[in-house]
A protein has these predicted regions:
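Conserved N-terminal helical subregion
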Residues: 1-5, 22, 47-166, 170-183, ...
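Conserved mid-domain beta->alpha element of the FAD-binding
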Residues: 7-35, 152-153, 180, 255-349
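Short phosphate-binding/catalytic loops that engage adenosine nucleotides
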Residues: 26, 59, 244
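Residues in the short beta-alpha loop(s) of Rossmann-like NAD(P)-binding domains
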Residues: 33-36, 43, 67
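Histidine-centered metal-chelating micro-motifs
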Residues: 159, 179-181, 202-205, 285-286
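Active-site substrate-recognition segment that forms the wall
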Residues: 193-225, 232, 236-241
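Flavin-binding catalytic cores
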Residues: 227-260, 316-317, 324-325
Length: 385
């Protein structure tokens, strides 16, 4: 089909959408509000569905080369006993690829490198759209106006464009948990590639990177907006008595590297991901809690599906209708499952509830864990060409 497209938001989903559009013949501009693209320092796990989407977009091999496969790990108690283990090799046999861990900044750089020079513009804030014409969308930029056949709203959980397109609709809500995370300053020795540890009202996890360092995260049930003068000191007090390597990971972290964000989600699903010639994508469409590690993967699915629909359908309208029909039910189901996983994980605090959960996990056969992962990760992208 081809045409001109404006992608609002230069995160993982927005860049992936731009890659897909560019590969299928569209002239694309990406508008990012941030003035610089210095990454905040987080890491990310990519499941098979996210990697397959990246393969469809042509960047899968580069991402795999920069990632570390996550073969060994599972879920533990604060004392260190195992609640469940995951066989990454078995998962690879089932899906053709393991889960991989990668620094978000590295992934972002690989996506940027796949776009033409000059495609990405930073320091550009989009606060409105001109949708008066039936076959075009105007995007106000500074004192001018960009004219587009298609706009992709990938401006995150707090999307301004979502609020404009669906006035009066439910926006993001606080999910009841806050997350602190960082990447270690130096390589660390880890027995497992990834771990989750569930305590009462708290979770601690890590993923290992190819350079020997690791990202860790700590999720706490807390009121929204609570901050700490010394976040790393607070974490040492809260998690210092938990099993190794948790204290070791904290010791290997610089205080200024710790990031702190409240978790928000779209608890009320959108009735559509499309409004005229505008498509919502990623967190702007289906912001979810991070409990399944599927947020970025779902955004990558969005990007590949949108590009394929626009490549095969005869009109923008039919392509966006196909995109909405294929992506909205699946992504919203994953968001519901992530919310349920959070309730079973760090949100449980009563000792009896925690004990019952732990007993259930210990008794569950390993194939139950495998099925839970396959339910969301076993996805095949549509062909772009």
């Amino acid at each position: 089909m081809g045409g001109t497209a404006v992608v609002v938001g230069g995160g993982i989903g927005g860049l992936a959408a731009a890659i897909g559009l560019h590969r299928t013949g569209w002239d694309v501009q990406v508008l990012e509000r941030a003035g610089t693209l210095a990454d905040a320092g987080a890491g990310i796990s990519l499941h098979a569905n996210g990697l397959r989407a990246l393969d469809a977009l042509g960047v899968g091999p580069a991402v795999r080369a920069a990632s570390r496969p996550q073969y060994t790990g599972g879920t533990r108690t604060p004392e260190g006993s195992w609640l469940s283990r995951m066989d990454g090799a078995a998962l690879e046999r089932a899906l053709g690829t393991p889960i991989v861990g990668i620094r978000r900044s590295v992934l972002h750089g690989l996506l940027r490198a796949a776009l033409p020079a000059g495609c990405l513009r930073t320091g550009v804030t989009v606060t409105g759209l001109d949708r008066t014409a039936p076959d075009r969308v105007g995007v106000p930029v500074g004192d001018g106006m960009l004219d587009a056949d298609l706009v992709v709203a990938a401006d995150g959980v707090g999307s301004r464009l979502r609020g404009l397109l669906f006035p009066g609709g439910a926006g993001p809500v606080y999910a009841g948990s806050t997350v602190l995370r960082a990447i270690t300053e130096r390589p660390v020795r880890l027995r497992c590639d990834f771990e989750l540890t569930w305590g009462g009202g708290a979770e601690f996890g890590h993923i290992a990177f190819s350079d020997g360092r690791a990202e860790w995260h700590a999720v706490l049930t807390a009121p929204a907006g609570v901050r700490h003068a010394d976040p790393l000191g607070m974490l040492h007090r809260r998690f210092g008595g938990w099993h190794d390597p948790i204290p070791h990971l904290l010791d290997a972290t610089r205080p200024q590297a710790v990031l702190h964000h409240d978790i928000h989600e779209l608890a009320t699903p959108l009735r559509s991901f499309v409004a005229g010639r505008v498509a919502l994508l990623g967190d702007a469409a289906h912001a979810m809690t991070p409990n399944l590690g599927q947020g970025a993967c779902q955004a990558l699915e969005d990007a590949a599906t949108l590009a394929a629909a626009l490549a095969h359908e005869p009109s923008v309208a039919s392509a966006l209708a196909r995109y909405d029909a294929e992506r909205r039910p699946r992504s919203q189901a994953v968001a519901r499952a992530a919310r349920q996983a959070g309730r079973m994980g760090q949100r449980l605090s009563h000792p009896l509830a925690v004990a019952l959960r732990n007993t259930g996990l210990r008794l569950a056969p390993s194939r139950v864990t495998m099925r839970a992962i396959l339910r969301h990760a076993d996805w095949t992208p549509p062909a772009l060409g």
